[in-house]
Swiss-Prot record:
Keyword Signal found: no
Main location: cytoplasm
Gene Ontology molecular function: arginine-tRNA ligase activity; ATP binding
Short motif 'HIGH' region, span: 122-132
Protein name listed in UniProt: Arginine--tRNA ligase
C-alpha cells in the first residue's frame, strides 16, 4: 500500500482533466506539519504557470475534479496553490487491517527486475579493514531491500584477486609451504603480505621468480592457478567470518573478482581501437573523452592499456558492465564504492556506452559514499595511526556492548545476555553508519552509537522489546486479535496508523536510491510515534475491550514493522533486553 502513489495518481488525473498535459506532476509528499494535512500536493503552481493560469484558480479547478471519496476526510487550498490532504480515519483503519494480515506488511511486489549489486570488494591476501565497512553494510541493506521488493538480485563481490602482486604472493606461499608454515603464517594475512613484499624488495632471486610467476599465471599455468586459488580461498574464508559476524548475506558463491573479467580485456581494447575510440599515445591505448577536460581544458585521456600491455581498473569496469548486461541479463547494476571513485566510474561507463556495449535502458548506477572519520575529523585510524582491522573493530564493539548490557540488565540468562550483547554491539556499528546519508562523511563515535537515546541501534532494539513486553503481559494471541476492528478515535492512533502505512513508500525509495538512512529515519519516527501513543493511549488496562484490542493490533503492526525494517538493515532484534 503506497499512499503517496495513490494520491499522486488521483491528483494527476484531476490535473489532466483540468487542462494539464500527460507529463504533469502532482509532487505529492507527506506534510511537514500537521496543520498542512497528512499529505500535500506541491505541483499545482508549476503546472498553472505552464498553462498561464492563476495557481489558486487552477488548484480550485483540480480540487473540484479530484475523486478522493472515502480516502480523504477533507482537502483545502493553502498559500499560493498547495493542496493539503487530510486522510479519512476509517480508510486508514481499513488499510491497517489489510496490512496486518499481509506477510509483506502491505509492500506490493514491483515489476521484477534482475539487479546486480557490486559491494564489499576486499583484496586477496589482505585483511578487511574499516574502509570496507561502508560498502559492505550499505550494499547489503540495499540488497535485502531489493529482494524484499521482489527483485532478482545478483550479489557481486568484486574482489581484488588479480594483478602483478600475485607473482610475489604465489612465490611466498610456495616458500612457506616448503617450510611447512602456511597454516600458521596465513592466519595473519597482513603479516603474510608484508613478508612477501619484503622478500620481493630485498631478494632478487625471489623477485625474479615472482615476475616469472606473474607471466605464468596470466598465461593460465596450472600450478600458478592452483596456488592463486589457494590464496583466494584462504582470504575469502577469513572474510566470510567478518560477513557472518556482521550479519551480511554475502557468501563465497558471490565472488566475482577482477580475474573473472581478465580474459575479456584484450578483446575489449582491440574493439575500442577498431571503433576508433582508443588511440595509441606513447605506447599506451587511450580513450579521449570530450565530456571530461584536463587542467589545460583539453579532452581527458583515459588509459585502457598501458604500454607494457597491462590493463587498468577502467578496462575491468568496462568488461564488468558488459558482462552484467549480456551474460547476467541484468536490468540495473549498482556499484557501492567510495565517492573518490566517482569520476573513474563515470568515465568507464561513458566509454562502455560510447562503444555500444550496453543499451541506454541498462541502468548503471554508482552509489557513492563518504568517509568514516574519527572524532578529530580525520580518517578513522588506530591510536598509532594505523589502519583499523575490521575484526578488531567488531571485537571492541562486543566488549563495549558487554559492559553496557552488564550495567543495565540483571534479569537476563547468560544465553539471553550473550544474544543481546551481540545484537547491540554489531547492530550499533552498522546502524551508526546506515542511519547517515551515505554520500556524506560521518564521525565514528562509540558513545553516541551505543546510547539508548536518539537514532541508534540500542534505542530501536529497545523500542522493539518494549512492544514485545506488552504481549508478554497478556494472554491474547495474534489469532484472537484477528477479528477485532481497528478504531482510530485518538489523534495519536491516527498519526501512528499513517506512519505504519508509509512503510512501502519508504522501502521503495531505499530500493530506488540506495539510501538506507531513509529507512532508519522512518523507523526512528515510527518508534517515537509509538512511544507517544503508548504514553497517551492506555492499552492493557483499558476498560473498553474493543479499544484495547484495536490498540493491541496497532502495537502488533508496529512490532512487525520495526522487526522487518531492522531486518532489511541487517540489524538483529532480541525478545528481551
Amino acid at each position: 500500500m503506497n499512499i503517496q502513489s495513490i494520491l499522486s495518481n488521483k491528483i494527476k488525473q484531476a490535473m489532466r482533466q483540468a487542462g494539464a498535459d500527460e507529463q504533469c506532476d502532482a509532487l505529492v509528499k507527506p506534510s511537514s506539519k500537521p496543520q498542512f494535512g497528512d499529505y500535500q500536493a506541491n505541483g499545482i503552481m508549476a503546472t498553472a504557470k505552464k498553462l498561464g493560469l492563476n495557481p489558486r484558480d487552477f488548484a480550485q479547478k483540480v480540487l473540484d475534479l479530484i475523486d478522493l471519496k472515502n480516502i480523504a476526510e477533507k482537502m483545502e487550498i493553502a498559500g499560493p496553490g498547495f493542496i493539503n490532504i487530510f486522510l479519512d480515519k476509517n480508510w486508514l483503519a481499513e488499510n491497517i487491517q489489510v496490512t496486518l494480515q499481509d506477510k509483506k506488511l502491505g509492500v506490493t511486489v514491483e515489476e521484477i527486475q534482475t539487479i546486480v549489486v557490486d559491494y564489499s570488494s576486499p583484496n586477496v591476501a589482505k585483511e578487511m579493514h574499516v574502509g570496507h565497512l561502508r560498502s559492505t553494510i550499505i550494499g547489503d541493506a540495499v540488497v535485502r531491500t531489493l529482494e524484499f521488493l521482489g527483485h532478482n538480485v545478483i550479489r557481486a563481490n568484486h574482489v581484488g584477486d588479480w594483478g602483478t602482486q600475485f607473482g610475489m604472493l604465489i612465490a611466498y606461499l610456495e616458500k612457506m609451504e616448503n617450510e611447512h608454515a602456511s597454516a600458521m603464517e596465513l592466519a595473519d594475512l597482513e603479516a603474510f603480505y608484508r613478508a612477501a613484499k619484503e622478500h620481493y624488495d630485498n631478494d632478487e632471486t625471489f623477485a625474479e621468480k615472482a615476475r616469472n610467476y606473474v607471466v605464468k599465471l596470466q598465461n593460465g599455468d596450472a600450478y600458478c592457478r592452483t596456488m592463486w586459488k589457494k590464496l583466494v580461498d584462504i582470504t575469502m574464508q577469513q572474510n566470510q567470518r567478518n560477513y557472518d559476524r556482521l550479519n551480511v548475506t554475502l557468501t563465497q558463491n558471490d565472488v566475482m573478482g577482477e580475474s573473472l573479467y581478465n580474459p575479456m580485456l584484450p578483446e575489449i581494447v582491440a574493439d575500442l581501437k577498431a571503433q576508433g575510440l582508443a588511440v595509441e599515445d606513447e605506447g599506451a591505448q587511450v580513450v579521449y573523452l570530450e565530456e571530461f577536460k584536463n587542467k589545460d581544458g583539453d579532452p581527458m585521456g583515459v588509459i585502457v592499456q598501458k604500454k607494457d600491455g597491462g590493463f587498468l581498473y577502467t578496462t575491468t569496469d568496462i568488461a564488468a558492465a558488459k558482462y552484467r548486461y549480456h551474460t547476467l541479463k541484468a536490468d540495473r547494476a549498482l556499484v557501492f564504492s567510495d565517492t573518490r571513485q566517482s569520476q573513474h566510474m563515470q568515465q568507464a561507463w561513458l566509454i562502455t556506452r560510447k562503444a555500444g556495449y550496453v543499451p541506454d535502458s541498462f541502468q548503471l548506477e554508482h552509489k557513492n559514499f563518504g568517509m568514516m572519520l574519527g572524532k578529530d575529523g580525520k580518517p578513522f585510524k588506530t591510536r598509532s595511526g594505523g589502519t583499523v582491522k575490521l575484526t578488531d573493530l567488531l571485537d571492541e564493539a562486543i566488549e563495549r556492548a558487554d559492559k553496557l548490557i552488564s550495567e543495565k540488565s540483571t534479569a537476563l540468562s547468560s544465553k539471553e545476555k550473550a544474544a543481546v550483547i551481540e545484537a547491540v554491539g554489531i547492530g550499533s556499528v552498522k546502524y551508526a553508519d546506515l542511519s547517515k546519508n551515505r554520500t556524506t562523511d560521518y564521525v565514528f563515535d562509540w558513545d553516541i552509537m551505543l546510547s539508548f537515546e536518539g537514532n541508534t541501534a540500542p534505542y530501536m532494539q529497545y523500542a522493539y522489546t518494549r512492544i514485545r513486553s506488552i504481549f508478554n503481559k497478556t494472554d491474547i494471541s495474534e489469532e484472537q486479535l484477528h477479528p477485532a476492528k481497528i478504531q482510530l478515535t485518538d489523534e495519536k492512533e491516527r498519526l501512528l496508523a499513517i506512519k505504519l502505512l508509509q512503510f512501502e513508500e519508504t522501502v521503495q525509495i531505499v530500493g530506488k536510491e540506495g539510501t538506507p538512512h531513509i529507512l532508519c529515519a522512518y523507523l526512528y519516527e515510527l518508534a517515537g510515534l509509538f512511544s507517544s501513543f503508548y504514553e497517551h493511549c492506555p492499552i492493557l488496562n483499558n476498560d473498553n475491550e474493543n479499544v484495547k484490542l484495536s490498540r493491541l493490533k496497532l502495537a502488533l503492526l508496529t512490532e512487525k514493522t520495526l522487526k522487518q525494517g531492522l531486518d532489511l538493515l541487517g540489524i538483529k532484534t532480541v525478545e528481551k533486553m
